[in-house]
Curated annotation (Swiss-Prot):
Name recorded for this polypeptide: Uricase-2 isozyme 2
A family per Pfam: Uricase
Family stated for the protein in its record: Belongs to the uricase family.
Lineage: Eukaryota, Viridiplantae, Streptophyta, Embryophyta, Tracheophyta
Compartments in which it is found: Peroxisome
Pathways per UniProt: Purine metabolism; urate degradation; (S)-allantoin from urate: step 1/3
GO terms under biological process: purine nucleobase catabolic process; urate catabolic process
Amino acid sequence: MAQQEVVEGFKFEQRHGKERVRVARVWKTRQGQHFVVEWRVGITLFSDCVNSYLRDDNSDIVATDTMKNTVYAKAKECSDILSAEDFAILLAKHFVSFYKKVTGAIVNIVEKPWERVIVDGQPHEHGFKLGSEKHTTEAIVQKSGSLQLTSGIEGLSVLKTTQSGFVNFIRDKYTALPDTRERILATEVTALWRYSYESQYSLPQKPLYFTEKYQEVKKVLADTFFGPPNGGVYSPSVQNTLYLMAKATLNRFPDIAYVSLKMPNLHFLPVNISNKDGPIVKFEDDVYLPTDEPHGSIQASLSRLWSKL
């Protein structure tokens, strides 16, 4: 999106923005039920403000403090609850339409996972607790109206105590890892998926569509990792499980064009302890040493053949 210019004999690209703008928004229904979101917002603007770099002329700059204030102003204007994706698009669209010099905007949001609490079997009308994984999104909007929308998950921690192994890998003089067909498989999934919508006018009009889609994608990823409740599904490697999770996402959601997954292999090492008198702890698939330093790092992406990504 950034345009390269020749300035005083040099190639030059620039952008500016505001990061880590924290905003919370509460909506209240007539029935007394409250809804809350907490977002960390980042903004990047692409604009014709070269003079601010070359000389003392700031007349074309949108101040980053103005960007911060705009986040709160637009949150105030949102009278109905909306998804992080819709708010990101709303903000980006504002910057490219309101400011003549701004040619494009990137807005990214990380949503803090506040979840409604259950008290005595009933959803509390205004009580929330902090969950674990985070909902992320990034909207890229250009003055022409073109759009790229990406959503994601950070920190989806999953573990299964069996139905995992790793065998027949390359062996050489540096290899010490034994083959195993029985191990704990644990990871913290970072997922990104990009929607196929290419303009603001092609977006679904259903309220909270992207919030629902986030929950549905998360369920597909987890269900594919674990398999059926009785018996599960065998994982011959993190690589294979990652691929199946990405493929299941594309197969389930036709409006998703691209999926990227990062899945570190968080190790649970068998514990065997002995002394001269014999075993103190004999490992029988029961006692482990959990460690994530160092850990394996596995990542891959999958996209449809017609995708431009």
